[in-house]
Amino acid sequence: MIVSSKAERVQEAIRSIGGDARGQAVDVSDEKAVGSFFTNLGVFDHLVFTAGDSLQLHELAETDLKQARRAFELRYWSVLAAVKYGSPHIRSGGSIVLTTGIAGQRPQKGWVIPASVCGTIEGLTRALAIELAPIRVNAVSPGVVRTNLWQNMDSAERERFYQDIGKSLPVRRVGEAHDIAQAFLFLMKEGFSTGQTVVVDGGTVLV
């Protein structure tokens, strides 16, 4: 079941995946809507949470605190609501996989908010792994990946950014969505890992 706050993203994902994929638009910032969704969904095996708006990259002096709160609303409080209402419906042997990012481990200038959110999610992952055991709880920490997370940048500037980052990495390229998907699948299948953050960054933290 694919869920997004925006119906068009749900339909786009369904078309991309094909087969018998199903989806539903749910306002993930609305606690009651999230709770109702999981009640109606019933039992399932794995919860993967990847929601996030385009990154707001500003130095602290220029940071809009309203936007900063919005980032935490979507990327932390919405996660907490999804786990709170979703975890009781997870079958035995199931798991939860959250999404963080290398901003928490290797922040750049202007990344105050993304770094704060990522660090918070990594701490939450460890705490939930203890509290929700035996449900496994892990996180994936992507590096720079070609996704709409960077759509606030001008297209030409964004492409230069991708090229510059790619040249600096040991793998000589930025990530693609399918690179990151493999990490989520691994954590869903790997039954002896919990409380872990798997970094898939092309070597970003090394350089």
PLM regions and their residue ranges:
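Rossmann-fold cofactor-recognition segment
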Residues: 16-32
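Catalytic Tyr-x(3-8)-Lys segment
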Residues: 158-179
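Catalytic loop of short-chain dehydrogenase/reductase
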Residues: 68-72, 76, 81, 95-133, ...
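Conserved mid-core segment of classical short-chain dehydrogenase/reductases
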Residues: 52-69, 151
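Conserved Rossmann-fold SDR core element
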Residues: 122, 131-146, 193-200
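Conserved glycine-rich Rossmann-like NAD(P)H-binding loop of the short-chain dehydrogenase/reductase
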Residues: 1-12
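C-terminal substrate-recognition "lid" of short-chain dehydrogenase/reductases
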Residues: 173-200, 205
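Hydrophobic positions on the long internal alpha-helix
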Residues: 48, 78-86, 124-125, 183
